[in-house]
Amino acid sequence: MKRIVLLMAVFAAVAVQLRAQTIATFNFHRLGSIEIELFDDKPITVSNFLKYAASGRFENQIIHRWVPGFVIQGGGYRVNTSDPQQYEIERVQIFGTITNETRVGTFRSNTFGTIAMARVGNETNSASSQWFINLDDDNGRPVAEGGSNLDNASGGYTVFGRVISNANVLNLFVPPPPVNGIHIREDIIPLSPMAVLTTNELSWNDLVYVDLSFRREMNLQATRNIRGIRQIAWSSVAGVTNSVDYSANLTNWVNFTNVVGTGAQMQFTDSSTDAQRFYRVKLLY
């Protein structure tokens, strides 16, 4: 089981309303990074995306499809570097397909800077590992209105996050090549049209790799009453074991409890009267 420590903090008071959110950093090789907020009200889709990342199946993934001004797409192919003498491009091994959540929770349109799940043809519930980022505000609109109808075609393409910083990096993919030093290769089947960073002989360093990292803003907070009893509260992550630890020195951590998150605020009482304690919440995937 992979353990991911997503936040560690102590605050002075407990808020009434706490909201968790996962922030994903997408680092595009040689181009820059963007941050995307993942939407908790698309729980199946977000959990699926995080599962691929935590399992290592997204390691060395590449942008295998680029349509300028429309989408960039990843999650389908990666570079296997297990043999240093012979790298090879291989398909990302999938866990299976997931339920379409286009209209679960808040409906969000496929507009510039949103991330959505790719699917197989017209099969509504066929998304697995592949994702795409929209490069046009009109992608979700009907074709008759000048859009690509991604919001409605065969149940729609589930939007599960949006860019919150460094959108200028996405703008590099909007104009057609050779602007911004990104080029298209259409002779590497089935990775066509594929984004590359050279017009010369292609090397492994010229692919557009995407490295992912995550942080969870869980609003972990603590307060102490007049008897010295501490109350710890945080925005839990639904369907995942939330592990609460404490430490007196930020070095040696002791587990308090493990609970399955509900997606709502959770609380835990620490009856210790130690002068100082730090707390953290880990997610056990």
Annotate each predicted stretch with a short phrase.
Residues 8, 65, 260:
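Residues that line or immediately flank small-molecule/substrate-binding pockets and catalytic motifs
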Residues 213-285:
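Short, composition-biased motifs enriched in small/polar/acidic residues
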Residues 4-14:
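Sec-dependent N-terminal signal peptides
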Residues 11, 51, 56, 91, ...:
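Preference for short coil/turn "hinge" residues that link or interrupt alpha-helices
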